[in-house]
Regions:
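Structure-specific DNA junction-binding interface
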Residues: 1-65, 69, 76, 80-109
Length: 109
């Protein structure tokens, strides 16, 4: 008989799948912990944008989520700033350009 394939071509063994799920959970927890540090004011927007260029944990955070973690910034303010600056909804911190970063620092720094 032919072997039944997993949907979408995931050919992981159960051990590989478990390891990948564990790693994904660790990364999500690390991103959440970083956002808590941003929310508390321990990390500034300048620090976060700089860290996003080199740290894959920070770089994978959605830009809007980072802005919403800033003290005093909610969904509406984050969205209007992103629209004004020209940052796409799907953009992650690592993908923010230098000029966009400068404008974010000007607004929220």
């Amino acid at each position: 008989m032919t072997e039944k394939k997993a949907p979408f071509g995931n050919n992981f063994t159960p051990e590989q799948r478990a390891a990948a799920l564990k790693r994904a959970a660790e990364l999500r927890a690390a991103r959440a912990e970083y956002l808590v540090r941003v929310k508390s004011g321990e990390v500034s927007i300048t620090d976060a944008l700089e860290a996003g260029k080199g740290d894959p944990v920070v770089g994978r955070i959605k830009a809007k989520r980072l802005l919403m973690a800033l003290p005093g910034v909610g969904a509406a303010k984050a969205q209007s700033a992103m629209t004004a600056i020209g940052i796409a909804e799907s953009r992650r911190v690592a993908g923010i350009g230098q000029r966009q970063a400068e404008k974010l620092i000007e607004l929220f720094g």
